[in-house]
């Protein structure tokens, strides 16, 4: 186990929040010169850290704690009716482990996704450099899982393996196929992959109740959140019964 007290951290200046309007955000980064490894990553994930490229980070805002680390306890996960329908609809897809690096095929799908879904965000416009710097990593145990229909790439789940689970880093997919709900399908597959690997958790990143783009994560129960320094089960009512 790493002595975390020896690590150095760097905090960014305050800047506009990407998720909540009229709020200021700040991010805490692990010293990029530190000897980062999957083991250290696993330890820091228990404290709410995530990976972006070769960096480990977590929100560290002065006046806001809306970004709450979340993970699914996969052994107790029960898919909803909607989840079962989505899995059935995508049963024709095959899953392949792609090389975790830039390729023209992967980037073409990524760019189409960013252009369609994030044209008004700070990830637009996409670039090859952005793809590489955001998704690939020199030291992490990173996997690109590609979902294909008769050889055609429809979705990619960028997934990191940790000591106690998988971390769902990012998913991008063909935006012209909304009927497939490819983002949901990829997350459900990652839950199943945790079960196959006998890993107890799928780390989802940050749950933000007030942000529609991030609040969907409470659809995957049982969901645990990191609050006051410990992981606790978080439950949301499901009025739709779906």
UniProtKB/Swiss-Prot annotation:
Similarity comment: Belongs to the R-transferase family. Bpt subfamily.
A single Gene Ontology CC term: cytoplasm
PANTHER family: ARGININE-TRNA-PROTEIN TRANSFERASE 1, ARGINYL-TRNA--PROTEIN TRANSFERASE 1
Function of the molecule: Functions in the N-end rule pathway of protein degradation where it conjugates Leu from its aminoacyl-tRNA to the N-termini of proteins containing an N-terminal aspartate or glutamate.
Highest taxon of source: Bacteria
Gene assigned in the entry: bpt
Compartments, as annotated in UniProt: Cytoplasm
InterPro entries, alphabetized: Acyl_CoA_acyltransferase (IPR016181), Asp_Glu_LeuTrfase (IPR017138), N-end_Aminoacyl_Trfase (IPR030700), N-end_Aminoacyl_Trfase_C (IPR007472), N-end_Aminoacyl_Trfase_N (IPR007471)
EC number: 2.3.2.29
Any Pfam family hit: ATE_C
Catalytic activity: N-terminal L-glutamyl-[protein] + L-leucyl-tRNA(Leu) = N-terminal L-leucyl-L-glutamyl-[protein] + tRNA(Leu) + H(+); N-terminal L-aspartyl-[protein] + L-leucyl-tRNA(Leu) = N-terminal L-leucyl-L-aspartyl-[protein] + tRNA(Leu) + H(+)
Organism: Alcanivorax borkumensis (strain ATCC 700651 / DSM 11573 / NCIMB 13689 / SK2)
Record flagged with keyword Acyltransferase: yes
GO biological process, one term: ubiquitin-dependent protein catabolic process via the N-end rule pathway
Main enzyme class: transferase
Protein's UniProt name: Aspartate/glutamate leucyltransferase
Single GO MF annotation: leucyl-tRNA--protein transferase activity
Keywords from the UniProt entry: Acyltransferase, Cytoplasm, Transferase
């Amino acid at each position: 186990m790493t002595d975390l007290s020896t690590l150095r951290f760097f905090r960014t200046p305050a800047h506009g929040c990407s998720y909540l309007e009229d709020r200021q955000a700040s991010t805490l980064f692990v010293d990029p010169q530190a000897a980062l490894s999957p083991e250290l990553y696993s330890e820091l994930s228990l404290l709410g850290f995530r990976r972006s490229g070769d960096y480990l980070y977590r929100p560290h805002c002065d006046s806001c704690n809306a970004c709450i680390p979340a993970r699914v306890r996969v052994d107790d996960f029960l898919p909803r009716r909607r989840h079962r329908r989505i899995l059935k609809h995508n049963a024709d897809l095959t899953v392949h482990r792609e090389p975790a690096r830039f390729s023209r095929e992967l980037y073409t799908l990524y760019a189409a996704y960013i252009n369609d879904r994030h044209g008004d965000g700070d990830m637009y416009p996409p670039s090859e450099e952005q793809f590489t710097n955001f998704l690939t990593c020199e030291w992490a145990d990173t996997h690109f899982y590609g979902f294909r229909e008769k050889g055609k790439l429809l979705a990619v789940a960028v997934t990191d393996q940790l000591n106690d689970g998988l971390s769902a880093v990012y998913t991008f997919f063909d935006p012209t196929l909304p009927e497939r709900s490819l983002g949901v399908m990829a997350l459900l597959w990652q839950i199943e992959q945790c079960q196959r690997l006998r890993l107890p958790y799928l780390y989802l990143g940050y749950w933000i109740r007030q942000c529609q783009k991030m609040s969907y994560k409470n659809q995957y129960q049982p969901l645990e959140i990191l609050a006051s320094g410990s992981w606790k089960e978080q439950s949301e009512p499901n009025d739709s019964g779906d």
